[in-house]
A protein has these predicted regions:
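Structural motif
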Residues: 25-34
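Ser/Thr-centric signal marking residues that sit
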Residues: 1, 28, 106
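Serine-esterase "nucleophile elbow" of acetyl-processing enzymes
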Residues: 1-24, 38-42
């Protein structure tokens, strides 16, 4: 079967019009500096799924040899996440300027266990994702915006094409949740 992207799945299962402004590899910096300008007043819904690449760009944090107390390590993690969290909230704040109803998506955990590149940090990466997702929930609550929990959608290895990217099946599940959300709005 052909491997469809989330956008292709959306177009296949819904008669609504969809525009993807996300770029592969984009971070919260990219979204703030160049992607939000593509949101228009005609849009009725926006889906924000960003932050995973920011975490991926900081994955080396998990391989550091810390000789600190757990408190100090957690403080280091908080400091590392701070600019990402600030960017994320700035994006959400800008999205509230548009008439489109936003949906925030948590960062999924990836299929890291057993992968050559990420197996040794799979569990700590899951914790790092949880710390960031906590910020997404907090920001969603602050701005009264619904949050879609991607960790409940991407649950098996079949949902991933590789340790990081969703597969055809995972993308289809994500698209179905987006359509369900749009239809229930």
């Amino acid at each position: 079967t052909d491997e469809l992207s989330v956008l292709e799945h959306l177009k296949h299962i819904s008669n609504d019009e969809f525009l993807q402004i996300a770029l592969d590899g984009a971070t919260t910096d990219h979204v703030l500096s160049s992607q939000l300008e593509h949101v228009s007043e005609e849009d009725t819904h926006t889906v924000l799924s960003v932050g995973g690449n920011d975490l991926l760009n900081n994955i080396s944090f998990l391989t550091q040899d810390f000789r600190y107390s757990p408190n100090r390590v957690l403080e280091q993690l908080r400091q590392m996440l701070l600019p990402i969290n600030k960017n994320y909230e700035a994006i959400v704040q800008k999205l509230t300027d548009y008439r489109a109803t936003p949906l925030l998506c948590t960062v999924y955990e990836g299929d890291l266990v057993g992968s050559e590149e990420f197996d040794s940090i799979a569990e700590s990466a899951r914790s790092m994702v949880s710390f960031f997702n906590d910020s997404i929930y907090r920001i969603g609550s602050k701005y009264n915006i619904e949050v879609l929990e991607l960790r409940e959608i991407f649950v098996t290895s079949e949902d991933y094409a590789n340790p990081i990217e969703p597969s055809h099946k995972g993308g289809q599940k994500f698209a179905k949740e987006i359509v369900r959300w749009v239809d229930n709005e």
